């Protein structure tokens, strides 16, 4: 079966006129004659050269897909427990030795796995322009080249070379004698891209092997390149170049030419070919082209700078060896240096896209945080957001929306790293600008703006372990409260005040909020909570919804005052339970998981039980009744639902009775027996049924279903049978 050629390098929705994103390709008939990949590229170049003009691009406010991020099971020593299990994703579950308690900390660390990191890719709109001989158009400033210079950003695509990664979940069982509940927090990262063009069949990739290719050490670059200023008299027209004979080796040779025209031509050809052919990336690596392209970032000619940045952007996409080689050749610092001093929008697009691509590799994040974070924040994020602290003398240059989108995509990746997360929290103006942008978009009903998703995912990540890593007013209040309880209980060894502190069953005055929050104080401020809830109520993008719920999930995941205060703020003051409960109806399992985990966290606080009852109980029991369990998130969803029901039913047993249907109880019972494939959900279901049996008001519901002491003993398990029977 012959496939039609790929006729576009960009997502259709990026432009109102699709012609702006097309390459000049041979006819379909020619494509079916079996020409080689190299011949096809050369034919495309020659046909594009003959174009007389190209239409200008439309707005760079690109729409993009609703993909959520995957999970990365990185080792984390949170609470210093943990055993790792792996199914379709990585899972880490912390278990203590509590007899009847369930996890008091079961957090998700959401990071960007390689195969779902969405980073910018670039492709030339028209590889070159044709001008009649002898009548070359006058080039723009800094240009002496007559072919088309404009580069467009194409849809972001996932890395195809790495296996899917999953959640990092951790939890500990409560200490013996105390019934505790699970805490969940989540950690989010990258996913930003646009939908693929469905109207155009895609040519099969030229390199589909998942094995890492063997790379030849790159050739050292000639450091004696000439970077002279462009000369108008040296202009050449594109038809003077023998494009039909251009190859990757010749293009790499062009990079070392002392003529800037040939430098740009070589870089553009590499950029164009690497978009078409994955194997070209390895060839450029072997020929030492990366170091030459990095050197060209220092060229005084803007066309050469733009071409080199675009070529590097495509070279590093999906290629870890090329990313590492770019770093080794000092490419990160050169790119950051050029971004700091360049005022060209097109160059800024290429450089921020390059940095976004590089940021998906963990080995590069530390250097990117150190070098790129200041420039991205000061030159892109703060100016575009419109935020100002009133004392800043920072220049307010106009920033293109696509540059902002690329920059937030890069920071979205960097925020997943532990060191990067803390550095980003402390960087002046970053959180303020991200929050200002999200709030402005919500106020303007632009909740599905593509950059809002990136900003929310950054804020989600920066909220991870906030109570443990950032000094907050809650921590100071909790410290003072603990000292007060310790002094009062020092005369007796049987006081339960310490238990109350651990289980959040105490009343303490919550700290007053800052009138004008700054930096990390924004992350737990009521204005931020209100913004997240408003966004959850208005956005239709699954990734944005998941990020909002994940940020709230992180804020409610601790065992102290912050979780209590945030839960009350969300559920009572801001009346956010309806928005959260609606997440459980989503068709996206990532969204359902985040919503269910957030409700599980909030249900730990008795002060919320009454308000949560009728608003949450119907949706949570519906999950236990109808959830099919056929997704990778099913175990987390079902275990969260069991814990939420368990918490709420103890304080409102009569209300709970009306929602305990036969089908729900049968599903929970079957879940108890499914210990092999869903151990966490089975444990949560077992604890739910055990507490129902222990309740005088609810035991009758189980008896009506045919449950008896022997059956409940079997559910408890042989090891726990003695403890179980002793409770009745």
UniProtKB/Swiss-Prot annotation:
Originating organism: Mus musculus
- Where is it localised? Nucleus; Cytoplasm, Perinuclear region; Cytoplasm; Cell junction, Desmosome
InterPro entries from the xrefs? Answer: ARM-like, ARM-type_fold, Armadillo, Plakophilin/d_Catenin
Residues of the region (Required for WNT-mediated nuclear localization) are 161-270
Question: Keywords for this entry?
Answer: Cell adhesion, Cell junction, Cell membrane, Cytoplasm, DNA-binding, Membrane, Nucleus, Phosphoprotein, Repeat, RNA-binding
Which named protein is this? Plakophilin-1
Q: What does this protein do?
A: A component of desmosome cell-cell junctions which are required for positive regulation of cellular adhesion. Plays a role in desmosome protein expression regulation and localization to the desmosomal plaque, thereby maintaining cell sheet integrity and anchorage of desmosomes to intermediate filaments. Required for localization of DSG3 and YAP1 to the cell membrane in keratinocytes in response to mechanical strain, via the formation of an interaction complex composed of DSG3, YAP1, PKP1 and YWHAG.
The gene coding this protein? Pkp1
Its family remark reads: Belongs to the beta-catenin family.
Annotated region Required for interaction with EIF4A1: the residues are 1-287
Q: In which tissues is it expressed?
A: Expressed in undifferentiated keratinocytes of the epidermis at birth, expression increases as differentiation proceeds (at protein level). Expressed in the cervical loop during early tooth differentiation, expression is then present between ameloblasts, at ameloblast-ameloblast junctions and in the stratum intermedium during pre-secretory and secretory stages of tooth development (at protein level).
The subunit structure is: Part of a complex that contains DSG3, PKP1, YAP1 and YWHAG; the complex is required for localization of DSG3 and YAP1 to the cell membrane in keratinocytes. Interacts (via N-terminus) with KRT5/CK5, KRT8/CK8 (via rod domain), KRT15/CK15 and KRT18/CK18 (via rod domain) as part of intermediate filaments. Interacts with VIM (via rod domain). Interacts with DSP. Interacts with DES. Interacts with FXR1; the interaction may facilitate the binding of PKP1 to PKP2, PKP3 and DSP mRNA.
Q: Does the keyword Transmembrane apply?
A: no
Q: Does the keyword Nucleotide-binding apply?
A: no
Please give the GO cellular component terms listed in this UniProt entry: cornified envelope; cytoplasm; cytoplasmic stress granule; desmosome; nuclear stress granule; nucleoplasm; nucleus; perinuclear region of cytoplasm
In this chain the ARM repeats are located at 244-275, 276-317, 318-360, 361-412, 413-443, 505-536, 537-583, 584-629, 630-694
Under the heading Pfam families, the entry gives: Arm
